From Swiss-Prot:
The lineage of its organism: Eukaryota, Metazoa, Chordata, Craniata, Vertebrata. The record marks S215, S219 as: Implicated in catechol agonist binding and receptor activation. One of its GO terms (biological process) is positive regulation of epidermal growth factor receptor signaling pathway. Signal peptide: none annotated. The modification Phosphoserine is found at S346. A lipid is attached at C457 (S-palmitoyl cysteine). The chain crosses the membrane at residues 49-74, 86-111, 122-144, 167-187, 210-232, 390-410, 425-444. It comes from Homo sapiens. This is Alpha-2A adrenergic receptor. It is linked to Lipodystrophy, familial partial, 8: An autosomal dominant form of partial lipodystrophy, a disorder characterized by abnormal subcutaneous fat distribution. FPLD8 patients show selective loss of subcutaneous adipose tissue from the limbs, beginning around 13 to 15 years of age, and abnormal accumulation of subcutaneous adipose tissue in the dorsal neck and face, as well as in the posterior thoracic and abdominal regions. The disorder is associated with metabolic abnormalities, including diabetes mellitus and hyperlipidemia.
Length: 465
Protein backbone atom coordinates (compact mmCIF):
# COMPACT_ATOMS: atom_id res chain seq x y z
CA UNK A 1 0.00 0.00 0.00
CA UNK A 2 2.73 2.41 0.97
CA UNK A 3 5.92 2.00 -0.95
CA UNK A 4 8.71 3.86 -2.60
CA UNK A 5 8.19 5.11 -6.13
CA UNK A 6 8.59 2.45 -8.80
CA UNK A 7 7.56 2.19 -12.43
CA UNK A 8 3.99 0.93 -12.52
CA UNK A 9 2.87 -2.12 -14.40
CA UNK A 10 0.44 -1.28 -17.13
CA UNK A 11 -3.02 -0.70 -15.73
CA UNK A 12 -1.92 -0.39 -12.10
CA UNK A 13 -3.86 2.40 -10.40
CA UNK A 14 -4.91 3.43 -6.92
CA UNK A 15 -8.66 3.06 -6.41
CA UNK A 16 -10.43 5.91 -4.65
CA UNK A 17 -7.16 6.93 -3.11
CA UNK A 18 -4.23 8.67 -4.66
CA UNK A 19 -3.81 8.76 -8.39
CA UNK A 20 -0.13 9.13 -9.05
CA UNK A 21 1.41 10.72 -12.12
CA UNK A 22 2.98 8.21 -14.47
CA UNK A 23 6.20 6.94 -12.98
CA UNK A 24 7.79 7.18 -16.38
CA UNK A 25 6.63 10.74 -16.98
CA UNK A 26 9.70 12.88 -17.43
CA UNK A 27 7.83 15.92 -16.16
CA UNK A 28 8.64 14.85 -12.65
CA UNK A 29 10.08 11.35 -12.36
CA UNK A 30 13.83 11.38 -12.69
CA UNK A 31 13.94 15.16 -12.83
CA UNK A 32 14.97 15.64 -9.23
CA UNK A 33 17.99 17.86 -9.03
CA UNK A 34 21.28 16.07 -8.39
CA UNK A 35 22.22 15.92 -4.75
CA UNK A 36 18.63 16.00 -3.51
CA UNK A 37 17.52 19.34 -4.93
CA UNK A 38 13.95 20.58 -5.17
CA UNK A 39 11.42 18.19 -6.66
CA UNK A 40 9.77 19.10 -9.92
CA UNK A 41 5.97 19.20 -9.81
CA UNK A 42 3.90 17.22 -12.33
CA UNK A 43 1.97 20.33 -13.44
CA UNK A 44 2.77 23.89 -14.35
CA UNK A 45 1.98 26.65 -11.88
CA UNK A 46 -1.12 27.73 -13.82
CA UNK A 47 -2.53 24.20 -13.96
CA UNK A 48 -1.73 23.64 -10.29
CA UNK A 49 -3.56 26.81 -9.24
CA UNK A 50 -6.55 25.84 -11.38
CA UNK A 51 -6.73 22.37 -9.83
CA UNK A 52 -6.43 23.79 -6.31
CA UNK A 53 -9.20 26.33 -6.93
CA UNK A 54 -11.57 23.75 -8.44
CA UNK A 55 -10.95 21.19 -5.70
CA UNK A 56 -11.28 23.89 -3.03
CA UNK A 57 -14.62 24.98 -4.48
CA UNK A 58 -15.76 21.36 -4.55
CA UNK A 59 -14.87 20.92 -0.87
CA UNK A 60 -16.62 24.13 0.18
CA UNK A 61 -19.81 23.32 -1.73
CA UNK A 62 -19.85 19.77 -0.36
CA UNK A 63 -19.45 20.83 3.27
CA UNK A 64 -21.82 23.79 3.03
CA UNK A 65 -24.60 21.93 1.21
CA UNK A 66 -24.54 18.81 3.35
CA UNK A 67 -24.36 20.77 6.61
CA UNK A 68 -27.51 22.56 5.45
CA UNK A 69 -29.17 19.19 4.84
CA UNK A 70 -28.36 17.99 8.37
CA UNK A 71 -29.55 21.23 9.98
CA UNK A 72 -32.74 21.19 7.91
CA UNK A 73 -33.65 17.64 8.93
CA UNK A 74 -33.16 18.38 12.63
CA UNK A 75 -34.88 21.78 12.68
CA UNK A 76 -37.75 21.49 10.19
CA UNK A 77 -40.94 19.82 11.40
CA UNK A 78 -41.73 18.80 7.84
CA UNK A 79 -38.47 16.80 7.60
CA UNK A 80 -38.48 14.99 10.95
CA UNK A 81 -39.82 11.70 9.63
CA UNK A 82 -37.55 8.85 10.86
CA UNK A 83 -36.47 7.77 7.39
CA UNK A 84 -34.88 11.17 6.78
CA UNK A 85 -32.13 9.98 9.13
CA UNK A 86 -30.82 8.12 6.09
CA UNK A 87 -30.24 11.49 4.45
CA UNK A 88 -28.42 12.76 7.55
CA UNK A 89 -26.06 9.79 7.52
CA UNK A 90 -25.52 10.10 3.77
CA UNK A 91 -24.74 13.81 4.13
CA UNK A 92 -22.30 13.01 6.95
CA UNK A 93 -20.41 10.61 4.69
CA UNK A 94 -20.15 13.29 2.01
CA UNK A 95 -18.84 15.82 4.54
CA UNK A 96 -16.19 13.35 5.68
CA UNK A 97 -15.13 12.82 2.07
CA UNK A 98 -14.68 16.58 1.64
CA UNK A 99 -12.69 17.02 4.86
CA UNK A 100 -10.66 13.81 5.29
CA UNK A 101 -10.12 12.53 1.75
CA UNK A 102 -10.26 15.19 -0.97
CA UNK A 103 -7.60 17.51 0.58
CA UNK A 104 -5.03 14.70 0.67
CA UNK A 105 -5.96 13.48 -2.79
CA UNK A 106 -5.45 17.01 -4.05
CA UNK A 107 -2.06 17.38 -2.35
CA UNK A 108 -0.96 14.03 -3.67
CA UNK A 109 -2.04 14.99 -7.17
CA UNK A 110 -0.39 18.39 -7.42
CA UNK A 111 2.80 17.38 -5.54
CA UNK A 112 3.32 14.13 -7.43
CA UNK A 113 4.23 12.07 -4.38
CA UNK A 114 2.86 11.11 -0.95
CA UNK A 115 4.04 13.54 1.71
CA UNK A 116 2.06 12.50 4.79
CA UNK A 117 3.72 9.29 5.92
CA UNK A 118 2.91 5.60 5.93
CA UNK A 119 0.42 5.53 8.82
CA UNK A 120 -1.83 8.21 7.37
CA UNK A 121 -1.56 6.60 3.94
CA UNK A 122 -3.21 3.45 5.25
CA UNK A 123 -5.89 5.39 7.14
CA UNK A 124 -6.54 7.70 4.20
CA UNK A 125 -7.03 4.88 1.70
CA UNK A 126 -9.33 2.94 4.03
CA UNK A 127 -11.46 6.03 4.74
CA UNK A 128 -11.69 6.83 1.04
CA UNK A 129 -13.11 3.41 0.20
CA UNK A 130 -15.29 3.44 3.34
CA UNK A 131 -17.04 6.73 2.59
CA UNK A 132 -17.65 5.95 -1.06
CA UNK A 133 -18.98 2.50 -0.21
CA UNK A 134 -21.20 3.85 2.55
CA UNK A 135 -22.78 6.34 0.15
CA UNK A 136 -23.97 3.71 -2.27
CA UNK A 137 -25.01 1.30 0.51
CA UNK A 138 -27.06 4.16 2.00
CA UNK A 139 -28.81 4.61 -1.35
CA UNK A 140 -29.42 0.87 -1.48
CA UNK A 141 -30.96 0.95 2.00
CA UNK A 142 -33.17 3.91 1.03
CA UNK A 143 -34.39 1.99 -2.02
CA UNK A 144 -35.23 -1.07 0.08
CA UNK A 145 -36.97 1.12 2.66
CA UNK A 146 -39.04 2.61 -0.14
CA UNK A 147 -39.88 -0.82 -1.56
CA UNK A 148 -40.97 -2.22 1.80
CA UNK A 149 -43.14 0.81 2.48
CA UNK A 150 -44.91 0.09 -0.81
CA UNK A 151 -45.27 -3.67 -0.64
CA UNK A 152 -45.95 -4.02 3.10
CA UNK A 153 -47.88 -0.78 3.52
CA UNK A 154 -49.26 -0.40 7.04
CA UNK A 155 -47.22 -3.20 8.59
CA UNK A 156 -43.85 -1.72 7.61
CA UNK A 157 -44.83 1.87 8.32
CA UNK A 158 -45.78 0.90 11.87
CA UNK A 159 -42.32 -0.64 12.30
CA UNK A 160 -40.46 2.32 10.79
CA UNK A 161 -39.33 3.94 14.03
CA UNK A 162 -36.27 6.14 14.64
CA UNK A 163 -34.67 3.32 16.59
CA UNK A 164 -35.10 0.86 13.72
CA UNK A 165 -33.80 3.37 11.16
CA UNK A 166 -30.73 4.03 13.32
CA UNK A 167 -30.10 0.29 13.54
CA UNK A 168 -30.24 0.04 9.74
CA UNK A 169 -27.81 2.96 9.42
CA UNK A 170 -25.36 1.27 11.80
CA UNK A 171 -25.64 -1.88 9.70
CA UNK A 172 -24.89 0.14 6.57
CA UNK A 173 -21.68 1.49 8.08
CA UNK A 174 -20.63 -1.96 9.32
CA UNK A 175 -21.14 -3.45 5.85
CA UNK A 176 -19.15 -0.60 4.34
CA UNK A 177 -16.33 -1.16 6.82
CA UNK A 178 -16.21 -4.88 6.08
CA UNK A 179 -15.77 -4.07 2.40
CA UNK A 180 -13.27 -1.26 2.97
CA UNK A 181 -10.80 -2.56 5.54
CA UNK A 182 -9.35 -5.73 3.93
CA UNK A 183 -6.55 -3.70 2.31
CA UNK A 184 -5.28 -2.87 5.80
CA UNK A 185 -5.13 -6.58 6.61
CA UNK A 186 -3.80 -7.85 3.30
CA UNK A 187 -1.20 -5.40 2.09
CA UNK A 188 1.24 -6.32 -0.59
CA UNK A 189 4.56 -4.69 0.09
CA UNK A 190 6.51 -3.93 -3.04
CA UNK A 191 9.91 -2.47 -3.63
CA UNK A 192 11.21 -3.47 -0.21
CA UNK A 193 14.16 -5.53 -1.46
CA UNK A 194 17.79 -4.85 -1.01
CA UNK A 195 18.08 -2.72 -4.14
CA UNK A 196 18.30 1.04 -4.09
CA UNK A 197 15.14 2.80 -3.02
CA UNK A 198 13.86 5.71 -5.14
CA UNK A 199 13.38 8.96 -3.30
CA UNK A 200 9.66 9.45 -4.02
CA UNK A 201 7.23 7.75 -1.57
CA UNK A 202 4.03 6.41 -3.05
CA UNK A 203 0.67 5.71 -1.39
CA UNK A 204 -1.22 3.03 -3.27
CA UNK A 205 -3.95 0.64 -2.24
CA UNK A 206 -3.69 -3.11 -2.66
CA UNK A 207 -3.68 -3.69 -6.42
CA UNK A 208 -4.01 -7.47 -6.38
CA UNK A 209 -6.55 -8.68 -8.89
CA UNK A 210 -8.69 -10.47 -6.30
CA UNK A 211 -9.07 -7.30 -4.25
CA UNK A 212 -9.74 -4.99 -7.18
CA UNK A 213 -12.54 -7.20 -8.49
CA UNK A 214 -14.06 -8.02 -5.10
CA UNK A 215 -13.96 -4.41 -3.89
CA UNK A 216 -15.56 -3.12 -7.09
CA UNK A 217 -18.32 -5.72 -6.84
CA UNK A 218 -18.94 -5.13 -3.13
CA UNK A 219 -18.57 -1.35 -3.20
CA UNK A 220 -20.48 -0.57 -6.36
CA UNK A 221 -21.78 -3.20 -8.75
CA UNK A 222 -23.69 -5.39 -6.26
CA UNK A 223 -25.48 -2.46 -4.56
CA UNK A 224 -26.23 -1.00 -7.99
CA UNK A 225 -27.79 -4.27 -9.10
CA UNK A 226 -29.94 -4.38 -5.97
CA UNK A 227 -31.12 -0.80 -6.51
CA UNK A 228 -31.94 -1.45 -10.16
CA UNK A 229 -33.95 -4.58 -9.35
CA UNK A 230 -35.78 -2.81 -6.52
CA UNK A 231 -36.57 0.15 -8.71
CA UNK A 232 -37.80 -2.04 -11.55
CA UNK A 233 -40.16 -3.67 -9.07
CA UNK A 234 -41.35 -0.28 -7.78
CA UNK A 235 -41.97 0.83 -11.35
CA UNK A 236 -43.95 -2.34 -12.10
CA UNK A 237 -46.16 -1.81 -9.05
CA UNK A 238 -46.75 1.84 -9.91
CA UNK A 239 -47.51 1.02 -13.53
CA UNK A 240 -49.99 -1.69 -12.56
CA UNK A 241 -51.82 0.70 -10.28
CA UNK A 242 -52.03 3.43 -12.89
CA UNK A 243 -53.84 0.96 -15.15
CA UNK A 244 -56.85 0.91 -12.81
CA UNK A 245 -59.77 2.17 -14.95
CA UNK A 246 -60.88 5.73 -14.18
CA UNK A 247 -64.24 4.43 -13.01
CA UNK A 248 -62.40 2.44 -10.36
CA UNK A 249 -60.39 5.40 -9.06
CA UNK A 250 -63.19 7.11 -7.19
CA UNK A 251 -63.45 7.07 -3.44
CA UNK A 252 -65.42 3.84 -3.48
CA UNK A 253 -62.90 1.93 -5.60
CA UNK A 254 -59.73 0.36 -4.38
CA UNK A 255 -56.43 0.39 -6.25
CA UNK A 256 -54.79 -2.96 -6.57
CA UNK A 257 -52.59 -3.72 -3.58
CA UNK A 258 -49.08 -5.06 -4.05
CA UNK A 259 -50.42 -8.61 -4.14
CA UNK A 260 -52.39 -7.79 -7.27
CA UNK A 261 -55.90 -8.35 -5.89
CA UNK A 262 -58.47 -5.62 -5.44
CA UNK A 263 -60.63 -5.03 -2.43
CA UNK A 264 -63.57 -2.77 -1.82
CA UNK A 265 -64.15 -1.00 1.46
CA UNK A 266 -66.70 -2.60 3.71
CA UNK A 267 -68.64 0.41 4.84
CA UNK A 268 -65.51 2.41 5.43
CA UNK A 269 -66.40 5.56 3.50
CA UNK A 270 -64.36 7.21 0.81
CA UNK A 271 -60.93 5.87 1.63
CA UNK A 272 -59.26 3.96 -1.19
CA UNK A 273 -58.64 0.62 0.40
CA UNK A 274 -59.08 -1.17 3.67
CA UNK A 275 -56.27 -2.58 5.71
CA UNK A 276 -56.48 -4.66 8.86
CA UNK A 277 -59.26 -3.46 11.08
CA UNK A 278 -60.44 -0.92 8.54
CA UNK A 279 -57.30 1.22 8.43
CA UNK A 280 -56.55 3.06 5.25
CA UNK A 281 -53.99 1.37 3.01
CA UNK A 282 -52.90 3.79 0.33
CA UNK A 283 -50.94 2.91 -2.77
CA UNK A 284 -47.30 3.80 -2.46
CA UNK A 285 -47.77 4.69 1.22
CA UNK A 286 -45.14 6.50 3.22
CA UNK A 287 -44.59 7.60 6.77
CA UNK A 288 -45.81 11.09 7.52
CA UNK A 289 -44.31 13.54 9.97
CA UNK A 290 -42.72 11.49 12.68
CA UNK A 291 -42.99 8.07 14.21
CA UNK A 292 -45.64 5.57 13.19
CA UNK A 293 -48.84 5.72 15.12
CA UNK A 294 -48.54 9.43 15.81
CA UNK A 295 -51.20 11.66 14.33
CA UNK A 296 -49.97 13.99 11.65
CA UNK A 297 -50.23 17.59 12.79
CA UNK A 298 -52.95 19.58 11.16
CA UNK A 299 -51.51 21.91 8.60
CA UNK A 300 -51.78 23.07 5.05
CA UNK A 301 -50.27 19.92 3.60
CA UNK A 302 -48.97 16.46 4.33
CA UNK A 303 -45.29 15.73 4.21
CA UNK A 304 -43.22 12.69 3.44
CA UNK A 305 -39.63 11.72 3.84
CA UNK A 306 -37.93 13.47 0.97
CA UNK A 307 -41.32 14.88 0.02
CA UNK A 308 -41.31 16.32 -3.43
CA UNK A 309 -42.07 19.57 -5.15
CA UNK A 310 -45.74 20.34 -5.06
CA UNK A 311 -47.92 23.38 -5.49
CA UNK A 312 -50.05 24.72 -2.70
CA UNK A 313 -53.07 23.19 -4.39
CA UNK A 314 -51.72 19.67 -4.78
CA UNK A 315 -54.18 18.34 -2.26
CA UNK A 316 -57.04 20.06 -4.05
CA UNK A 317 -56.21 19.64 -7.71
CA UNK A 318 -57.73 16.19 -8.15
CA UNK A 319 -60.88 15.41 -6.25
CA UNK A 320 -62.83 12.18 -6.50
CA UNK A 321 -66.57 12.24 -7.14
CA UNK A 322 -68.61 13.28 -4.16
CA UNK A 323 -69.00 16.44 -2.09
CA UNK A 324 -66.57 18.79 -3.82
CA UNK A 325 -66.75 22.04 -1.92
CA UNK A 326 -66.28 21.63 1.81
CA UNK A 327 -65.87 24.96 3.55
CA UNK A 328 -62.30 26.01 4.30
CA UNK A 329 -62.71 25.95 8.05
CA UNK A 330 -64.50 22.62 8.38
CA UNK A 331 -62.19 21.10 5.77
CA UNK A 332 -59.15 21.91 7.83
CA UNK A 333 -60.78 20.36 10.84
CA UNK A 334 -61.82 17.31 8.90
CA UNK A 335 -58.34 16.90 7.51
CA UNK A 336 -56.87 16.78 10.98
CA UNK A 337 -59.41 14.18 12.02
CA UNK A 338 -58.81 12.11 8.93
CA UNK A 339 -55.08 11.99 9.55
CA UNK A 340 -55.71 10.32 12.89
CA UNK A 341 -57.46 7.24 11.59
CA UNK A 342 -55.99 4.14 13.23
CA UNK A 343 -56.55 0.43 12.73
CA UNK A 344 -59.99 -0.42 14.06
CA UNK A 345 -61.49 2.97 13.22
CA UNK A 346 -64.10 3.40 10.54
CA UNK A 347 -65.69 6.30 8.75
CA UNK A 348 -69.34 6.49 7.70
CA UNK A 349 -70.11 5.96 4.06
CA UNK A 350 -71.62 8.68 1.93
CA UNK A 351 -74.91 8.43 0.13
CA UNK A 352 -78.15 6.62 0.73
CA UNK A 353 -77.87 3.00 1.63
CA UNK A 354 -74.14 3.26 2.07
CA UNK A 355 -73.91 3.00 5.81
CA UNK A 356 -71.80 0.26 7.31
CA UNK A 357 -73.05 -2.27 9.80
CA UNK A 358 -74.08 -0.49 12.95
CA UNK A 359 -73.03 2.88 11.48
CA UNK A 360 -75.51 5.75 11.24
CA UNK A 361 -75.97 7.67 8.01
CA UNK A 362 -73.30 10.24 7.33
CA UNK A 363 -74.10 13.81 8.26
CA UNK A 364 -72.79 16.94 6.54
CA UNK A 365 -69.76 17.20 8.83
CA UNK A 366 -68.85 13.56 8.32
CA UNK A 367 -69.18 13.96 4.57
CA UNK A 368 -66.67 16.78 4.73
CA UNK A 369 -64.29 14.52 6.63
CA UNK A 370 -64.64 11.84 3.97
CA UNK A 371 -64.19 14.31 1.12
CA UNK A 372 -61.11 15.81 2.75
CA UNK A 373 -59.65 12.38 3.32
CA UNK A 374 -60.24 11.29 -0.27
CA UNK A 375 -58.81 14.55 -1.60
CA UNK A 376 -55.77 14.20 0.59
CA UNK A 377 -55.28 10.66 -0.68
CA UNK A 378 -55.22 11.89 -4.28
CA UNK A 379 -52.69 14.59 -3.44
CA UNK A 380 -50.54 12.07 -1.61
CA UNK A 381 -50.69 9.73 -4.61
CA UNK A 382 -49.31 12.50 -6.82
CA UNK A 383 -46.54 13.25 -4.33
CA UNK A 384 -45.66 9.56 -4.25
CA UNK A 385 -45.03 9.61 -7.99
CA UNK A 386 -42.76 12.62 -7.66
CA UNK A 387 -41.00 11.00 -4.70
CA UNK A 388 -40.20 7.97 -6.82
CA UNK A 389 -38.82 10.28 -9.49
CA UNK A 390 -36.56 12.28 -7.17
CA UNK A 391 -35.16 9.14 -5.58
CA UNK A 392 -34.39 7.88 -9.07
CA UNK A 393 -32.56 11.16 -9.75
CA UNK A 394 -30.41 10.81 -6.62
CA UNK A 395 -29.50 7.22 -7.45
CA UNK A 396 -29.03 7.95 -11.14
CA UNK A 397 -26.66 10.85 -10.47
CA UNK A 398 -24.58 8.68 -8.15
CA UNK A 399 -24.31 5.93 -10.75
CA UNK A 400 -23.40 8.41 -13.49
CA UNK A 401 -20.67 9.93 -11.32
CA UNK A 402 -19.06 6.70 -10.11
CA UNK A 403 -19.70 4.10 -12.82
CA UNK A 404 -16.90 5.33 -15.15
CA UNK A 405 -14.33 5.03 -12.36
CA UNK A 406 -15.35 1.56 -11.21
CA UNK A 407 -15.65 0.30 -14.76
CA UNK A 408 -12.20 1.49 -15.80
CA UNK A 409 -10.70 0.35 -12.50
CA UNK A 410 -12.07 -3.14 -13.10
CA UNK A 411 -10.59 -3.09 -16.60
CA UNK A 412 -7.15 -2.46 -15.14
CA UNK A 413 -7.47 -5.60 -13.01
CA UNK A 414 -7.97 -7.79 -16.07
CA UNK A 415 -5.01 -6.30 -17.89
CA UNK A 416 -6.66 -3.66 -20.07
CA UNK A 417 -4.75 -0.45 -20.61
CA UNK A 418 -6.59 2.72 -19.58
CA UNK A 419 -5.15 6.17 -20.34
CA UNK A 420 -3.97 7.66 -17.08
CA UNK A 421 -5.44 11.09 -17.77
CA UNK A 422 -8.86 9.57 -18.45
CA UNK A 423 -8.65 7.52 -15.28
CA UNK A 424 -7.80 10.61 -13.23
CA UNK A 425 -10.76 12.46 -14.69
CA UNK A 426 -13.16 9.64 -13.78
CA UNK A 427 -11.63 9.52 -10.30
CA UNK A 428 -12.29 13.20 -9.59
CA UNK A 429 -15.64 13.11 -11.35
CA UNK A 430 -16.76 10.57 -8.75
CA UNK A 431 -15.87 12.99 -5.95
CA UNK A 432 -18.20 15.57 -7.48
CA UNK A 433 -21.17 13.44 -6.44
CA UNK A 434 -20.63 14.41 -2.80
CA UNK A 435 -21.72 17.98 -3.57
CA UNK A 436 -24.75 17.16 -5.75
CA UNK A 437 -27.33 15.69 -3.38
CA UNK A 438 -28.11 19.04 -1.66
CA UNK A 439 -28.60 20.55 -5.12
CA UNK A 440 -31.04 17.77 -6.05
CA UNK A 441 -33.00 18.26 -2.83
CA UNK A 442 -33.19 22.00 -3.45
CA UNK A 443 -34.47 21.61 -7.01
CA UNK A 444 -37.02 18.86 -6.44
CA UNK A 445 -37.99 19.14 -2.78
CA UNK A 446 -40.30 21.87 -1.51
CA UNK A 447 -39.68 21.11 2.17
CA UNK A 448 -35.90 21.18 1.85
CA UNK A 449 -36.00 24.36 -0.20
CA UNK A 450 -38.22 26.03 2.38
CA UNK A 451 -35.99 24.81 5.23
CA UNK A 452 -32.85 26.07 3.47
CA UNK A 453 -34.42 29.50 2.98
CA UNK A 454 -35.40 29.63 6.62
CA UNK A 455 -31.88 28.72 7.76
CA UNK A 456 -30.08 31.10 5.40
CA UNK A 457 -32.43 34.05 5.87
CA UNK A 458 -32.61 33.81 9.66
CA UNK A 459 -29.43 35.84 10.08
CA UNK A 460 -30.66 38.52 7.66
CA UNK A 461 -33.89 38.93 9.60
CA UNK A 462 -31.95 39.32 12.84
CA UNK A 463 -29.75 42.01 11.31
CA UNK A 464 -32.81 43.86 10.03
CA UNK A 465 -34.38 43.74 13.48
Amino acid sequence: MFRQEQPLAEGSFAPMGSLQPDAGNASWNGTEAPGGGARATPYSLQVTLTLVCLAGLLMLLTVFGNVLVIIAVFTSRALKAPQNLFLVSLASADILVATLVIPFSLANEVMGYWYFGKAWCEIYLALDVLFCTSSIVHLCAISLDRYWSITQAIEYNLKRTPRRIKAIIITVWVISAVISFPPLISIEKKGGGGGPQPAEPRCEINDQKWYVISSCIGSFFAPCLIMILVYVRIYQIAKRRTRVPPSRRGPDAVAAPPGGTERRPNGLGPERSAGPGGAEAEPLPTQLNGAPGEPAPAGPRDTDALDLEESSSSDHAERPPGPRRPERGPRGKGKARASQVKPGDSLPRRGPGATGIGTPAAGPGEERVGAAKASRWRGRQNREKRFTFVLAVVIGVFVVCWFPFFFTYTLTAVGCSVPRTLFKFFFWFGYCNSSLNPVIYTIFNHDFRRAFKKILCRGDRKRIV
